[in-house]
Swiss-Prot record:
CC annotations in GO: cytosolic large ribosomal subunit
Entry's Gene Ontology molecular function annotations: structural constituent of ribosome
HAMAP family xrefs: Ribosomal_bL19
Family matches, as SUPFAM superfamilies: Translation proteins SH3-like domain
Residues in coiled coil: none
InterPro entries to which the protein is assigned, alphabetical: Ribosomal_bL19, Ribosomal_bL19_CS, Ribosomal_bL19_sf, Translation_prot_SH3-like_sf
Role, per record: This protein is located at the 30S-50S ribosomal subunit interface and may play a role in the structure and function of the aminoacyl-tRNA binding site.
Name of the molecule in the record: Large ribosomal subunit protein bL19
Keywords: Ribonucleoprotein, Ribosomal protein
Disulfide cross-links: none
Source organism: Chlamydia caviae (strain ATCC VR-813 / DSM 19441 / 03DC25 / GPIC)
Gene expressing this chain: rplS
Length: 121
């Protein structure tokens, strides 16, 4: 039974490889939005706060501050609605979850930029 579930989940995975990003990186996620009969692409840019799960159910939580208000948005990485993911800047953090950024604004919400080669996973 468990093998059948795993096979079904593997069919749902993206065929093309996802961009390599980690917690602390600033990424831009382009999603497909359907408004009435029209289809358009909407882009959300934010800092990766958490990356959860694995397989078809893997999610990423992004955080950004716009007009003084903090926003959070979660995305299913293997969703067919995601058009693309682009890494804007690499971040240097010492935590796996950056939930402490929620209450911060301005410079306190900044993540140090990582400069140098990224070691493979």
């Amino acid at each position: 039974m468990g093998n059948l579930i795993k096979e079904l989940q593997d069919e749902q995975l993206r065929k093309e490889a996802l961009t390599d990003f980690r917690v602390g990186d600033t990424i831009r996620v382009a999603t497909k939005i359907v408004d009435g009969g029209k289809e358009r692409t909407q882009v959300f840019q934010g800092t990766v706060m958490a990356r959860r799960g694995g397989g078809a159910g893997e999610t990423v939580a992004l955080h950004r501050v716009a007009y003084g208000e903090g926003m959070e948005k979660s995305f299913l990485l293997h969703s067919p609605k995601i058009v693309g993911i682009e890494v804007v800047k690499r971040g240097k953090v010492s935590r796996a979850r950056l939930y402490y950024l929620k209450g911060k604004t301005g410079k306190a919400a900044k993540v140090k930029e990582y400069i140098g080669p990224r070691a493979p996973k």
